[in-house]
Amino acid sequence: MADYLCKFAERRGLSHSRSANNCVVIRKAASPGYEDCEPLVILNHMDMVCVAEAGYDTPGSVTPIEYEENGERWMRANHTSLGADNGIGLTMALAILDDDSLKHPALEVLTTTCEEDDMSGAANLPEDFIKGRRVLNLDSEAYDEITVGSAGAHIQVARLPYRRIAMPAGYVAYEVEVNWGRGGHSGVDINSGRANAIKILANLLLVAIRQMNIKLYLVSFEGGQAYSAIPGEAAAKVVIPREDIEVFENLVMQCHEAVMGQYSQTDPKIEVTCEPSVWHSSVINEEGTHILLACINGIPTGPVEMRSDVEAQENNASCVLTSNNIGLVKQGKESFTVSSHTRSFSNDRLNGLARNIEQIFTLTGAEVETVMHVGAWQEDVGHPLIKLTMDVFDEVLHFRPRPVEMHFALEAGYFTERFPGIHIASIGPRIINPHSTTEHVSLTTADNIWQVVKTLLSKA
């Protein structure tokens, strides 16, 4: 994608720079009469969360569906994530660069990498990469809001070692799966009560060991597709004593019924299943099995603490003060990799919960790596950029967007640290269920935001 952006600039005779982390900034000179205006940075990211339902993970195998509802045009995902986050914003930015009829100050169209993972693109930008100190971010997902703050975030990845042993005699193999969880964005949707498939699966297997006294061994365990996504699917291969088959199958059935009841409103299609599997010559030793399941079970997921102020309680997107998500478990030859994504509007609480989770990991002998840490961001809502953005909404769309703080980290946290004096306004179309296979984007609001952006450029 970075290659494409550089070629895009070259074909149009626009200067550009590329960072070591493949972030790209494309510069466009001010329109006549705008030469003395302060430069404006237009910010987006080029990476997208790619998740797919089982059987639909081949690129290009499905086509998004367009439809109309109550007079509003929509595009929705079709068994895969849509990529409206941040494809819509990036499309607008490229359209601006491609249209010489627009009136605007000097522009720096900045497109970052790894925003959906560890934000390493923004975190490692050279301090002279951009000159502008006004940033219009087109990565918001709430049409009637302007984002002026974000939670801090800490992502850590633990590597839990294990040993393989020969499969015990008299054992049979099963594949246990949690499927059709709704998933979603672990910031936007963290207060929705949606199921975390990794957590459900680990809890089920730990109950089998500790409460049902089944001497269970793992063969494999994996789940999730991204740090920042609530995992809707997880799968494990296990072996159990032949005499425990009936008890184990009944336990899985009971778990399925309990999960269906608990998540009937949030994850109506979720299911927990087990099927006999092929024979395995080796399994993960007892210690490795127990450590992985206990770690996952002991780490909190979902909201940990709620905000107490009235304004936050009125806004579901920011009513959570502190949260955590286990978004990804992968298996290597000698270790499991488990990710933990902590968020908070309070830097003290962010650091405190992250330390507690790290201690859970390290007590098991795991190696822990911090892959992202960014503090909370709070914009000055009285800054001229914020006022201008709200005035343009009023002029073009006849309403003023509500300033909000979002419960997920934004690159703004890094920008305010790396570029002193910077101010950021974040807007965008209505996107529902980002990072999931039920992602929707309102094309009607995308058109409206495009009109806002063009008008804002002419007044910036």
What are these regions (language model features)?
Residues 1-38:
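A non-catalytic alpha/beta surface segment that caps or lines the substrate-entry region
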Residues 34-117, 122-133, 310, 318-320, ...:
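Active-site metal-coordination/substrate-binding segment of hydrolases
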Residues 46-48, 110-118, 139-143, 182, ...:
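Acidic, glycine-rich active-site loops and adjacent beta-strand->loop/helix elements
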Residues 72-76, 115-117, 123-343:
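Midchain, well-structured core segments that form catalytic/ion-binding scaffolds
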Residues 189, 196-221, 379-422:
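Active-site-adjacent substrate-binding region
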